[in-house]
A protein has these predicted regions:
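Bacterial N-terminal signal peptides that target proteins for export
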Residues: 2-18
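Short consensus segments that form the blades of beta-propeller domains
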Residues: 84-95, 126-131, 158-164
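Surface-exposed loop and turn segments in beta-propeller and other repeat-based domains
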Residues: 114-130, 190-201
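Repeat-based blade/solenoid architectures
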Residues: 48, 55-61, 122-136
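Acidic/hydrophobic-patterned starts of short beta strands in beta-sheet-rich repeat architectures
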Residues: 70-78, 144-155
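Acidic, small-residue rich beta-repeat scaffolds with periodic aromatic anchors
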Residues: 30-69, 166-168, 173-235
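Structural signature of eukaryotic scaffold interfaces centered on beta-propeller domains
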Residues: 63-70, 137-145
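C-terminal motif of bacterial Sec signal peptides marking the signal peptidase cleavage site
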Residues: 25-28
Length: 235
């Protein structure tokens, strides 16, 4: 089996806050979806937006556009690739890069400001490299009804062969505070995903509002089913 670097660490990315939550209560949304009203939060569609440039480019996988008490926000999700030198000196490594950026503005026609950027980088010597945002679990919500949007991100990464685990990452950002869970899932002999290996939680989750903990646990449980499809496609 080819050498494999350790999987990317989500917990380290949570400083100072890691990364849309389930759009409109665990329903996927996209640029063409209609507006959805949530307590203290409005999810916006392309039809709601004035004809001015939006953050992102043609390679953007998903935009989640919302309005909360601070103004407008747009979460932009992308996936890119790179090649780096192997630190062991044995050639090169492919790298899959998942990038999430949050842009905000105080009102229509105002300029967009990038509030934060988060990346998950998966280097791999092969034979299989995967990295994907799990878009059905990404969006914006106002779970604690304070008028400020929280952002949830969910993703999966993989490097290796059929016996190697898939890494799962889920996180929620509320203002400047991030909460996250990461762990592993494998395919069993029947081709079903199962959680095993270590599971890590960000230290901040111990003091998180219960509604945030419940939300993250619900998304985490759903990732096992979602990752089965990705795992089967990889092998």
């Amino acid at each position: 089996m080819n050498a494999r670097l350790p999987p990317p660490g989500l917990i380290g990315l949570l400083r100072p806050a890691l990364l849309g939550t389930v759009c409109a209560a665990l329903a996927a949304c996209n640029d063409a979806a209609p507006s959805a009203q949530l307590p203290g939060l409005t999810l916006l569609s392309a039809q709601d937006v004035a004809a001015d440039p939006m953050p992102g480019n043609d390679d953007t996988l998903r935009r989640v556009h919302y309005r909360d008490l601070h103004g407008e926000g747009v979460l932009v999700l992308e996936r890119s690739a790179a090649v780096i030198n192997d630190p062991t000196g044995s050639g090169s490594l492919d790298v899959a890069i998942l990038t999430a950026r949050l842009y905000v503005r105080s009102g229509p026609r105002k300029g967009w400001t990038k509030l934060w950027q988060r990346q998950i980088r998966q280097p791999c010597a092969g034979p299989v490299l995967e990295a994907a945002w799990l878009l059905q679990h990404v969006g914006a919500t106002d779970l604690d009804d304070d008028g400020q949007a929280e952002i949830t991100l969910a993703s999966h990464t993989f490097c290796g062969n059929g016996s190697d685990p898939h890494q799962l990452h889920v996180s929620l950002i509320d203002g400047s505070t991030g909460y996250g869970i990461e762990g592993e899932t494998r395919l069993d002999a029947a081709g079903q995903a199962r959680f095993d290996g270590e599971r890590h939680q960000s230290p901040s989750l111990a003091s998180a509002p219960p509604v945030f903990v419940q939300h993250l646990e619900k998304v985490w449980s759903a990732l096992g089913d979602t990752s089965t499809t990705h795992a089967r496609q990889a092998h």
